[in-house]
């Protein structure tokens, strides 16, 4: 798939912009704080209805405006598909082929994206919430039912936590009813994640082996606070663990176990990657991004759109070359950079844009 054009109204520092893209490589050039990253963020937001930079919607809407609007035309094997998202203080309104979508899970997945940004380098050593977000974004794009199960799980979790906070005399019978519901949806969430991590590991290990000249093997472990022996017993194990934690949850007034607390661990040659070198960690992240592209292609039968936000400056020449070599010519790629000097072997069928003070100019490469 590829994004033919995007129309932007009141997004970040853009009042209005309309940009048509190459189906291959698109490079946004400009000094810092001119709006390069905002373009990639707009594409990301059009695909996923959320930003990768902030959880505060009001930061996305241009100063002194009340709403934003993004329109895009996506080319898929099945034909052209218009997408639209409106954001205001009333929430999100999404449309596919001009038809309003009842749920975000009905919208997400029509345009798939893989983002590689400098903050992704924190995926190995950062907080568990970053790794859960990584799973949610990738898995949500290729398996809409996951988003539905996750949404239902979070809804019951919110109910359970609210009840624990609301009283000092907890009704164990009522708490057990909530436990049953939480275990139902939570088991589904964990099962989806385990299947996804197994597929991701297979893809990422192959890429990491190539990057390390066949020296290193990559393993990914899903770390749950629920003792999981096999996928058939997840619900019962979750329910048992919730019951065992009743005293703790009542005392702390929150839910201490479940997929909302789970984590990922990465291992290079059986060593925890958080103790690895910076070079090893960068190769690991690069392997994950390559694996994301391959996995989305395998599941959806279409390549995702690749967003590279100022990451070339974070990679040495070897990793730059491996990244560029790994990008199939069918993968539409968007890249931001302050200069083309450090980039070599760029394909001829690219478009280059100059970004200055929230205005985008198409330019010819010398």
From Swiss-Prot:
GO MF term set: ATP binding; single-stranded DNA binding
GO BP of this protein: DNA replication; DNA synthesis involved in DNA repair; double-strand break repair; SOS response
Role this protein plays: The RecF protein is involved in DNA metabolism; it is required for DNA replication and normal SOS inducibility. RecF binds preferentially to single-stranded, linear DNA. It also seems to bind ATP.
GO cellular component annotations of the record: cytoplasm
Organism, as annotated: Streptococcus thermophilus (strain ATCC BAA-491 / LMD-9)
Major subcellular site: cytoplasm
Statement: the UniProt record of this protein carries the keyword Oxidoreductase: no
Homology family: Belongs to the RecF family.
Keyword Cytoplasm: yes
UniProt cross-references to InterPro entries, sorted A to Z: DNA-binding_RecF, DNA-binding_RecF_CS, P-loop_NTPase, RecF/RecN/SMC_N, RecF_2
Keywords per UniProt: ATP-binding, Cytoplasm, DNA damage, DNA repair, DNA replication, DNA-binding, Nucleotide-binding, SOS response
Intracellular or extracellular location(s): Cytoplasm
Protein name listed in UniProt: DNA replication and repair protein RecF
Binding site for ATP: 30-37
């Amino acid at each position: 798939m590829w994004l033919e054009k995007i129309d932007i109204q009141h997004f970040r520092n853009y009042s209005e912009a309309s940009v048509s893209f190459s189906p291959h490589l698109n490079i946004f050039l400009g000094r810092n704080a001119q709006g390069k990253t905002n373009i990639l963020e707009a594409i990301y937001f059009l695909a996923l209805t959320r930003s990768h930079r902030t959880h505060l919607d009001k930061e996305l809407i241009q100063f002194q405006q009340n709403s934003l609007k993004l329109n895009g035309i996506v080319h898929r094997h099945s034909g052209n598909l218009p997408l639209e998202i409106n954001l205001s203080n009333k929430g999100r309104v999404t449309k596919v082929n001009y038809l309003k979508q009842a749920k975000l899970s009905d919208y997400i997945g029509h345009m798939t994206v893989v983002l590689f940004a400098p903050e992704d380098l924190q995926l190995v050593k950062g907080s568990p919430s970053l790794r859960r977000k990584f799973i949610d974004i990738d898995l949500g794009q290729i398996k809409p039912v996951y988003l539905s199960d996750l949404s239902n799980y979070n809804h019951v979790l919110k109910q359970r936590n609210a009840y624990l906070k609301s009283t000092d005399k907890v009704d164990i019978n009522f708490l057990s009813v909530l436990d049953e519901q939480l275990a139902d949806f939570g088991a589904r969430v964990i099962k989806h994640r385990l299947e996804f991590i197994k597929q991701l590991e297979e893809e990422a290990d192959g890429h990491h082996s190539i990057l390390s000249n066949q020296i290193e093997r990559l393993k990914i472990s899903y770390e749950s606070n629920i003792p999981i022996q096999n996928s058939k017993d997840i619900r019962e194990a979750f329910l048992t663990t919730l019951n065992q934690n009743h005293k703790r949850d009542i005392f702390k007034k929150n839910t201490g176990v479940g997929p909302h607390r789970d984590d990922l661990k990465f291992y290079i040659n059986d060593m925890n990657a958080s103790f690895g070198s910076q070079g090893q960690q960068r190769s690991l992240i690069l392997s994950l991004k390559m694996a994301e592209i391959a996995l989305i292609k395998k599941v959806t039968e279409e390549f995702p759109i690749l967003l590279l936000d100022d990451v070339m400056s974070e990679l040495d020449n070897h990793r730059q070359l491996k990244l560029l070599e790994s990008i199939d010519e069918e993968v539409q790629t968007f890249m931001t950079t302050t200069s083309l000097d450090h980039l070599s072997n760029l394909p001829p069928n690219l478009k280059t844009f100059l970004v200055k003070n929230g205005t985008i100019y198409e330019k010819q490469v010398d």
